[in-house]
């Protein structure tokens, strides 16, 4: 039974105790029999650690002295699991609410095929529970673009099939402990954004696969931990992460096509930004 296999859920917190409390409350309802939770506090100054220890005394907390970013914080959490590590790890954003059945389908898909290295749930917007945020990921190094399949579309049969995909979003994914260690964890030159794509590109380059598993479901309060979906800070971090990704993975010919495509993509993204911010669609 897949529910007998040990799983640790790693959650990163930075000055987001209310979000983390709601996430942990949803995890309390999960019906998987053999899982633990590790909260990594990334140098919070809002007394998150005290609040979480008081409300969830059974949850392990790793308190870091300073903010090491998404990659660094998650890597320190992962490193703290030894000795006696779990068989699987799930990295989960603190601004999420999980379905009670979300763990088993992710583990089960990893067990069906030794070539599967990452599994990802179907992710909805929390404020519109049937509106999809992630149903697979696309990476196009020829155009320098990354996007989610199904984003801002209402759920339907076309988003209910298990399938291979290009990358696992860092919002939530599951891997074997040994494989995450083998791939070296998240690259800490990516403080936030595109580190998840970078990891999946290495996974696929090694001949492994990334699978979207719609039987696993979670809901995402998109960018709540960063002050909103349209914050200036988020846009800057995303642009920097994408540049680092292209610098690391694109070949010389792809650099040429990216430069050609960039003005068009910039215009599309500006239009999309204003449309979503001011018209909501």
Question: What are the language-model segments listed below?
Answer:
Residues 15, 27, 42-47, 68:
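Conserved short acidic donor-positioning loop in nucleotide-sugar-dependent glycosyltransferases
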Residues 25-34:
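Short, acidic, metal-binding catalytic loop of nucleotide-sugar glycosyltransferases
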Residues 49-84:
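Conserved donor nucleotide-binding strand/loop of the catalytic core
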Residues 87, 96-134, 139-141:
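Conserved donor NDP-sugar-binding/catalytic core segment of glycosyltransferases
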Residues 139-166:
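Short, flexible, basic/aromatic active-site loop/helix in glycosyltransferases
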Residues 166-217:
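A short, conserved alpha-helix in the catalytic core of glycosyltransferases
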Residues 231-281:
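Non-catalytic, C-terminal membrane-associated alpha-helical segments of glycosyltransferases
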């Amino acid at each position: 039974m897949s529910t007998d296999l040990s799983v640790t859920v790693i959650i990163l917190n930075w000055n987001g105790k209310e979000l983390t409390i709601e996430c942990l409350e949803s995890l309390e309802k999960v019906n998987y029999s053999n899982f633990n939770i590790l909260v990594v506090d990334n140098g919070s100054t809002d007394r998150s650690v005290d609040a979480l220890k008081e409300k969830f005394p059974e949850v392990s907390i790793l308190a870091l002295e300073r903010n090491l970013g998404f990659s660094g914080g998650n890597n320190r959490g992962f490193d703290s699991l030894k000795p006696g590590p779990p068989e699987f790890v799930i990295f989960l954003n603190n601004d999420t609410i999980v379905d009670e059945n979300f763990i088993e389908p992710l583990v089960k898909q990893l067990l069906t095929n030794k070539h599967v290295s990452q599994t990802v749930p179907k992710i909805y917007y929390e404020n519109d529970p049937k509106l999809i945020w992630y149903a697979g990921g696309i990476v196009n190094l020829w155009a320098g673009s990354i996007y989610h399949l199904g984003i801002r579309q209402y759920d339907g049969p076309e988003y209910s099939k298990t399938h291979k995909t290009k990358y696992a979003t860092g919002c939530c994914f599951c891997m074997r402990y040994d494989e995450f260690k083998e791939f070296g964890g998240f690259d800490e030159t990516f403080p936030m954004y595109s580190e998840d794509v970078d990891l999946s590109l290495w996974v696929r380059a090694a001949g492994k696969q990334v699978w979207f598993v719609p039987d696993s479901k979670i809901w995402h309060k998109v960018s709540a931990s960063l002050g909103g979906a349209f914050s200036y800070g988020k846009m800057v971090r995303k642009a920097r992460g994408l540049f680092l990704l292209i610098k690391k993975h694109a070949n010389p010919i792809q650099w040429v096509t990216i430069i050609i495509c960039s003005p068009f993509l910039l215009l599309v993204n500006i239009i999309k930004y204003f449309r979503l911010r001011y018209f909501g669609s």
